[in-house]
């Protein structure tokens, strides 16, 4: 597939997602990095988003709860170029009923080449990167060219 460039803005749109056994870990991480995160637009699946809002007072665009379709809503936003970074603390030791949605979310983040953290260490690296508060170009699939080729 041909690639094109997308510019992630200086003010990022960040999705925050956590499985039940990882919510407290994500909450602690968000509270530690609140001064950095406040400068960006936050999105989250339902329960996680409401917990973050309650604990920090930060505005969070909350989707549905993950098992109720929230993971798919975040994935759709990624596909539309509306999410720039995914912080997803998932539980590798416990299966969840919506595992296919989880796999789809991670697949879309990979397809659209956005930064993804699945644990606190990687999330720390992302927010401490010199690029975190700057506009940065990434390569993404050239969907218009892909569509034109498919419709020949």
From Swiss-Prot:
Substrate binds at residues 19, 23, 45-48, 65-66, 98. PANTHER family: METHYLGLYOXAL SYNTHASE. The keyword Chaperone does not apply. Belongs to the methylglyoxal synthase family. Pfam families: MGS (PF02142). Residues 6-152 form the MGS-like domain. HAMAP family: Methylglyoxal_synth. It catalyses: dihydroxyacetone phosphate = methylglyoxal + phosphate. It comes from the Bacteria. This is Methylglyoxal synthase. The gene is mgsA. One of its GO terms (cellular component) is cytosol. One of its GO terms (biological process) is methylglyoxal biosynthetic process. The active site is at 71 (proton donor/acceptor). Its EC number is 4.2.3.3. The lineage of its organism: Bacteria, Pseudomonadati, Pseudomonadota, Gammaproteobacteria, Enterobacterales. GO terms for molecular function: methylglyoxal synthase activity. NCBIfam families: MGSA, PRK05234.1. Catalyzes the formation of methylglyoxal from dihydroxyacetone phosphate. Keywords: Lyase. It comes from Citrobacter koseri (strain ATCC BAA-895 / CDC 4225-83 / SGSC4696).
């Amino acid at each position: 597939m041909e690639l094109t460039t997308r510019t992630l803005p200086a003010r990022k749109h960040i999705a925050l997602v956590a499985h039940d056994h990882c919510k407290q870990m994500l909450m602690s991480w968000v509270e530690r990095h609140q001064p950095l995160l406040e400068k960006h637009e936050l999105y989250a699946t339902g329960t996680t988003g409401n917990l973050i809002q309650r604990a920090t007072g930060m505005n969070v665009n909350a989707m549905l709860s993950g098992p109720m379709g929230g993971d798919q809503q975040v994935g759709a936003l990624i596909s539309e170029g509306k999410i720039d970074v995914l912080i997803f603390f998932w539980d590798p030791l416990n299966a969840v009923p919506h595992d296919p949605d989880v796999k789809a979310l991670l697949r879309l983040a990979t397809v659209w080449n956005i930064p993804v953290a699945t644990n606190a260490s990687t999330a720390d690296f992302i927010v401490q990167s010199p690029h975190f508060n700057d506009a940065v170009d990434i390569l993404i699939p050239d969907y218009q060219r892909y569509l034109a080729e498919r419709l020949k």
